[in-house]
Amino acid sequence: MDMSMSGSSAPLNDSGVDFSNETQAFDFLQLILDDSELQVVGNAYARAFWYGIVVVIGIAAIFNIIRVMTLKLRIRMAAKKHVQSARPKNIVMRSIATVTALGREIAYPRISPASGPAWFKVPTFGTILLLLAYLAFVLVLEFSNDDVPGGQHYTALGIRSAWLAVAQVPLLILLAGKYNLIGLLTGTSYARLNVLHRWVARMLLLLATIHFGTQNYGWDQYGLRKLEWSTDTCPRTGIAAYAILLWLNLSTLAPFRYFAYEFFVVQHLVTFFGFIIAAMMHLPSTALYSRVYIYIPIVLWFLDRVVRSLRYFYNNVRPGRATLEAMDGDVTRIRVTSKQVTSWVPGAYVLLSIPAFGFGQSHPATIASAPSSHSNDLVFILKGHRGFTNHVLKSVKSSAASKMEEETPPKSYVALIDGPYGGQHSDFAAFDTVVLISGSTGVTFTLSILLDLAHRASTQSLPVRALEFIWVVKDISWIRWISDELTAANHQLRTAGIETAFSIFVTCDNNFSNFSTDEDKASGCQCDKSLGPCCCIDVADDEGMMPTKSEESAGPAVCSDRSDNILPCATLISGRPSFKPLLWRLLDDAEGETGIAVCGPLGLSMSVRNTTSAISDERAVHKGTGAQGIYLHAEDFSL
């Protein structure tokens, strides 16, 4: 198909047209609006867009299949007592590892102002490169071979952008569903796809703006805009769809989501259906086949909702029962006993609802337990902020106060569960060395992985030789949240012959950090107390965040005087961790690929990301030096 339309007819021009004559002006306007051939071309470019999307998804799916098969092969080799099962053995696997290492070094880094507004976050370099490629691809489709001469020049640009805009809608919905084909094929979590979902919406807005602008500018060239708006319904339905689309994009900006998330979800859904209706009314009768790009996302959305509804009904046909426990640091520990939800992937999360604290409200919560732990109960650790978590915290505190006055059995509440979701990261049991890093309640993510590894190591041989667990907390009392779990996991791992080291960095506890100079040196603390508590010091140099005895504090876990009474299996350190020397030492000792998981505030995950990428480059991973690969999975606190 010749999509240039060159040579099909002479260019439209206004010679001999008297625009003061309304009949002649209207006839010329109809010639400008004659899009019978332009619609065919636009449809072809919309299909070309989807050909490109399918190719990208296909490539990502192939890499995902290779990744999953490689991890499964490692575990099978370890079960057969093969040594260095997490190390690529042949030239094919080494070549794949080299390409993977290069891609990770580019994709992992992230530069975002950690001290800025909570809602302002810059994506990772990998996401930025993907978005730039996406933008370039769409703009090439919009402007390539589209220089139609004459009076229909801007009409051609507008029609092309309209087709490309409507072609974005199915992709928009595919990236929004919690159960979606793209996530299944590529092994990408809903949270990561949701970032792309928002950027596809922005691309849709950009294309709609180009469509609106070029059409109106084309009419203005001949003074016909007023005539078009007064004689055609298309501009009015178009401005309605555009206004709704603009609001959809504005309301998804982080400040709006942070302000009232529950309201955002409801209005977002209602507004989206308003956009679909307005878009259907706007699509011209000359291109009714373009509505297939609207019908498809409607079907996809309903399929996602049907699957979610069926799963929700199954989960809650026999509702779970939740018991609550108030803990230090304004944290509530929730334990849910459910006969329906009995299996999940480590690191998965659910939308948890306890009707007693807000009917119809649900809160995303990472499952801190593993299916093999806590008698198959789901355990959550929620920090009290506002809304649901604040209601739960206040209630459990008041209940605890009343229990002190009179002994009563723990009260249980009906708990409704939507999920579990997530957990698309690689299986950490397939790595030679595992590093689990978390901050505050981000420990729920790493703890579930730790408990799963401990259980599996006690029942089978795994590729894992060494494990480092790092937890950054503000107050030493927070350790009690999971002290029993850490003690049990440490025992299981050591019994299985896995080298373990548990390091807990306490950043903001005066009682812990305010001891003598000799004690500081013995425990590895290097915070200058004259500047205030450790958490108040702005550490600009990453090297300055590591305790003086970095090798001792990051080495095998020992029972120090500072940890006997709270967590005997861990080393407690006052200050912040410096990840470069710690990771470098672990990678030096690794005999195969290292898996790193990090969950916590943006500053923590960003530091680990950038350090991992830098170390991989400096060590020339899989580039002939013998240095083994580094896999990183990062989870951030976000909505």
Regions found by a protein language model. Name each.
Residues M5-D35, R192, F273, G360, ...:
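Reductase modules of NAD(P)H-dependent flavoproteins
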Residues A162-W163, A191-F212, G439-I470:
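Classical protein tyrosine phosphatase
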Residues V41-V55, S95-V306:
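Membrane-embedded alpha-helical bundles of multi-pass integral membrane proteins
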Residues I57-K80, L174-I182, L253-F259, L303-P319, ...:
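Transmembrane-helix exit/juxtamembrane "anchor" motif
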Residues W247, L253, R257, E262, ...:
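Membrane-proximal cytosolic interface modules of multi-pass membrane proteins
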Residues M1-F26, M69-P117, D377:
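Extended, low-complexity, polar regulatory segments
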Residues A322-S412, K474:
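Ferredoxin-reductase
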Residues R76-S112, G320-K339, E406, N511, ...:
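Non-transmembrane, juxtamembrane loop and terminal tail segments
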